Amino acid sequence: MSDNYVALLGTKGGPAIRPGSSMPTSNLVVMSGQHILLDCGLGVTKGIVDQGMALKELSLIFISHMHSDHYLELGPLLHTAWTAGLKTKVTVYGPKGLDAYWDGFLASMKADIDLRIEDEGRPDLRNLLDIHVIDADKVYEQSGLTVSALRTEHPPLIDCFAFSFKTAAKHVVFSGDTAPIKALEDFARGADLLIHEAMLESALPALMTRIGNGSDKLMTHWLRSHTFAHDAAKTATQAGVKRLALSHLIPSDDPTYGPKDWQDACADHWSGELIVGGDGIKIEL
């Protein structure tokens, strides 16, 4: 295994899980000697340890936007890491609203946190997180790694970001949640790997039926705020990236659709290596 890789911890688009589905969005980026989390959907904690990483080694997290499938387990992850030995600060970069989420989580767990400090002698969890609100442009730079953000088109949210992770030798881009936008082509120009969200157009009506408690507004959201697989393929081609991986898959739990359907959806617009995401997949850089 290379010293630089991406692990797709959770590859499902949307917050719900059903029998046979993958888990919501989370990713582990290992570059320039750093282990970085991007998004913390449900299941991220187990996803990390399944990759062989100790939770107490957490240090840097990026959150793309304030939809629950991207940050729901941030609080439980940090609390579990704390009980697993975390004693150094974790830095989180994300949109406005994360601080309110964290304050609410701490308030909900106050009795347990106070008890473990008193009864077990642990450091105060409330002092172990630094949150930085991000905007587009360069977000982070350290040890030869530069992380940049691009605001995407994901209405009704305004603060939703794609991320670029770049060293002198490697370049990885995550689309974040977005409708197709020209700016992402420039942002991902020449990247070694583009990880792009994707939907299968023909599968959406059946998914609406399975969900059962959404109105036509949900379909409207998908169509205006996300990207079909064939459009992700077009973006990858226009950006001149070396490899394309599909993640945040909608749907991820319909047994009538498999990897070939995703490959067929991209075939007319992408001729390079295509990776159809699955939970736990490691992609070497």
Description of each model-found segment:
Residues M1-A179, L184-D186, K260-E284:
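Binuclear metal-dependent hydrolase catalytic cores
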Residues A162, H171-V173, A179-G278:
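Cap/insert and terminal regions of metallo-dependent hydrolase folds
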